[in-house]
């Protein structure tokens, strides 16, 4: 097992297996993580939350955001002070593995039951969702899920609904009902595919009532419902049924999987190199209207599928479970790298035609299936890109969405593997898939989402990110929605910085990459790592720095060269790689140099530093000329005397400057404050604001410019 992800409330990890259907031993049995000692201290809602977090902690049980749980509990009515039965059910949105107690909606069960009298038939079932609000218990603001009726009408106290790959594999077979009987021996019922809603809730409730011997029901093409008398019993039943399905599949699937390999996977380094070459090209071509962020995986199950004989047959069939194609679109785009001689340039030259063909196909699908009240067609570009020999890319509005889409398509691969191994895999009918994708209730959910932040979909690369200015800049860009690559030569400081950033913004928001800007190979490698992490780069902030002070007669060649290596050559190497990438990506870009007042104003005893900083400023001007035809803007922010949080000012440079000004180190910041025209201290956050201005569309018509952030220094006035 490979452990990834997060800690639910009892410290369990989210788990993903690399081969769920190979053998029971290979996949490993689902662990029963229920802890009686922990559970003993919980009330009934707490037990429901505990069960939910446990189920959501394992991707074999349910995917991110998928599934829901419920409990029918006796509570005191706040108006009558009498006991009433209340349905606690996971609300709309959220994720079982990470949800909190406020993630449940609560409804009077008798009021929910009374809605049956108002139901006008399947053509009108969407109107029932609004009526759920009239059943709310205790003014709970949590929006109710479309699956509420499926939980409420099952006549059992505790109900689980999950999207386990092993069960969906059976549910997506052409003979799913027959296999359900064969696998579970009459303990589990079967309902054919139907869009979730009030009507399916009535059918599920009726089946559970008519068959007291059932402990659950398989929903065709969708997933599993199970139930029990207690939270623990329901949880253990869910585990047992999923394990039973996985064991049966492992014992009956045909070998080799997917008809065997059509080709071998490329070597790992080749896969990474090809991915780094292709992802910016794709990203640029699909980001014309909205910037996309990418995700790359070459996990074993992905390689098995993209390299298989069954790829061309199965990929066009689309996914089955609604949760899958809501994230991944109905089908992926296969990029025929293997049929073009494993040649990246050949594939790159055909990308425009391949992407256009996918968009045309998606548009035709929309036109075939749309209804009079369907929402307008959404982005017609693919989300999932399969590359034989290489792996899978996914692109979406942000990193988390792209990663989760990738995880969902891995779920779909597992389902196709299991179903095709024991029967024939069947995707959802096209019209059914469309009706889910363009469901008015789903559209309403999209419309409720907050407006995107100003840097949403942008990817920034910041050097010197472990220091004061670099760290503040990273936080500023992250705060406005960018994904950020934090690069620094100080591994320990970088690790501490990235941990703090991830703690605040989440694991998809940022990556840390060790970088020596004076080492060409290190710079090139850091850009490849950045592409593999996010698919490209839009914003580059060159901020890596050193500082030195020495009279010219005492300045050694080594000291001179060190300043030039870091502050001139380092900025050149980063800018060159940025230009190469941004030109391939073809959607412009913003490069910001963090230089210094000393690049404009001469300073006694710091000739090497001043000359190197002047080099940065003029290099930026030259790059602005070269970048303009490509939409690449290059600007400079000039700080002065930013002491707080600075690694540069923490060492000899501070001592030297204090000695030069004939004050103590503690008095130095006040000296600089009084020296400024505005009598203000300049902080890292002030520089970050300047960088943000040049990185964002606020300065869309600005290039080749210098912004002094120094509280006013007449020597540095640009002329």
Predicted regions and their residues:
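Active-site helix of classical SDR
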Residues: 575, 612, 620
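Residue(s) in the substrate-gating loop at a strand-loop-helix junction
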Residues: 596
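Short C-terminal tail/terminal secondary-structure segment
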Residues: 601, 691, 703-719
């Amino acid at each position: 097992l490979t452990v990834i992800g997060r800690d639910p409330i009892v410290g369990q990890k989210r788990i993903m297996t690399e081969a769920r259907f190979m053998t029971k031993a290979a996949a490993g049995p689902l662990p029963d993580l229920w802890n009686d000692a922990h559970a003993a201290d919980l009330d009934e809602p707490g037990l429901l939350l505990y069960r939910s977090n446990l189920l959501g902690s394992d991707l074999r049980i349910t995917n991110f955001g998928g599934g829901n749980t419920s409990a029918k509990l006796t509570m005191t009515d706040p108006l009558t002070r009498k006991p009433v039965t209340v349905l606690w059910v996971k609300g709309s949105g959220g994720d079982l593995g990470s949800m909190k107690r406020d993630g449940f909606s609560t409804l009077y069960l008798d009021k929910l039951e009374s809605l049956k009298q108002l139901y006008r038939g399947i053509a009108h079932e969407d109107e029932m969702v609004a009526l759920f609000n009239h059943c709310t218990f205790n003014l709970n603001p949590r929006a109710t899920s479309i699956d509420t009726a499926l939980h409420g009408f099952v006549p059992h106290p505790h109900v689980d609904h999950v999207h386990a790959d092993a069960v969906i594999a059976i549910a997506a077979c052409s003979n799913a009902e027959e296999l359900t009987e064969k696998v579970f021996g009459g303990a589990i019922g079967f309902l054919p595919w139907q869009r979730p809603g009030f009507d399916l809730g009535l059918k599920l409730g009726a089946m559970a009532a008519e068959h007291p011997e059932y402990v659950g029901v398989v929903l065709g093409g969708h997933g599993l419902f199970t139930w029990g008398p207690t939270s623990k019993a329901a949880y253990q039943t869910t585990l047992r049924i999923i394990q039973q399905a996985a064991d049966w599949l492992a014992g009956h699937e045909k070998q080799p999987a997917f008809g065997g390999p059509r080709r071998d996977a490329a070597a790992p380094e080749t896969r990474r190199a090809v991915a780094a070459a292709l992802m910016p090209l794709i990203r640029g071509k699909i980001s014309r209207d909205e910037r996309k962020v990418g995700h790359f995986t070459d996990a074993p199950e992905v390689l098995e599928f993209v390299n298989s004989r069954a790829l061309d047959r199965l990929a066009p069939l689309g996914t089955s479970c609604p949760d899958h194609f809501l994230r991944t679109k109905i089908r992926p785009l296969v990029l025929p790298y293997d049929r073009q001689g494993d040649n990246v340039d050949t594939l790159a030259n055909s990308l425009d035609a391949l992407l256009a063909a996918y968009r045309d196909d998606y548009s035709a699908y929309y036109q075939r299936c749309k209804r009079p009240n369907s929402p307008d067609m959404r982005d017609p570009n693919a989300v999932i890109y399969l590359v034989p020999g290489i792996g899978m890319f996914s692109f979406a509005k942000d990193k988390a969405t792209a990663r989760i889409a990738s995880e969902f398509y891995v779920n779909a691969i597992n389902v196709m593997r299991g179903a095709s191994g024991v029967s024939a895999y069947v995707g959802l009918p096209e019209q059914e898939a469309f009706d889910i994708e363009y469901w008015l209730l789903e559209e309403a959910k999209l419309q409720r989402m907050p407006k995107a932040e100003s840097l949403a979909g942008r990817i920034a690369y910041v050097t010197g990110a472990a220091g004061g200015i670099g760290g503040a800049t990273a936080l500023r860009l992250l705060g406005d929605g960018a994904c950020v690559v934090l690069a620094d030569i100080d591994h320990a400081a970088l690790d501490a910085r990235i941990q703090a950033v991830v703690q605040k913004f989440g694991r998809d928001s940022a990556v840390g990459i060790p970088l020596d800007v004076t080492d060409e190979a290190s710079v090139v490698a850091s850009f490849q790592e950045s592409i593999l992490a996010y698919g490209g780069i839009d914003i580059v902030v060159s901020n890596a720095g050193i500082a030195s002070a020495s009279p010219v007669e005492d300045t050694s060649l080594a000291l001179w060269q060190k300043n030039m290596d870091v502050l001139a050559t380092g900025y050149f190497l980063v800018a060159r790689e940025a230009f190469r990438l941004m030109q391939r990506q073809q959607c412009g870009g913003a490069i910001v140099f963090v230089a210094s007042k000393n690049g404009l104003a001469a300073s006694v005893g710091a000739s090497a530093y001043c000359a190197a900083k002047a080099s940065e400023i003029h290099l930026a001007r030259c790059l602005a000329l070269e970048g303009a035809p490509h939409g690449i803007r290059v600007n400079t922010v000039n700080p002065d005397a930013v002491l707080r949080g600075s690694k540069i000012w923490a060492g000899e440079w501070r001592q030297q400057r204090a000695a030069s000004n004939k004050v103590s180190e503690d008095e130095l910041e006040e000296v600089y404050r009084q020296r400024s025209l505005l009598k203000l201290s300049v902080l890292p956050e002030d520089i970050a604001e300047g960088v943000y201005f040049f990185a964002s569309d606020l300065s869309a018509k600005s290039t080749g410019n210098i912004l002094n952030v120094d509280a006013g220094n007449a020597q540095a006035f640009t002329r």
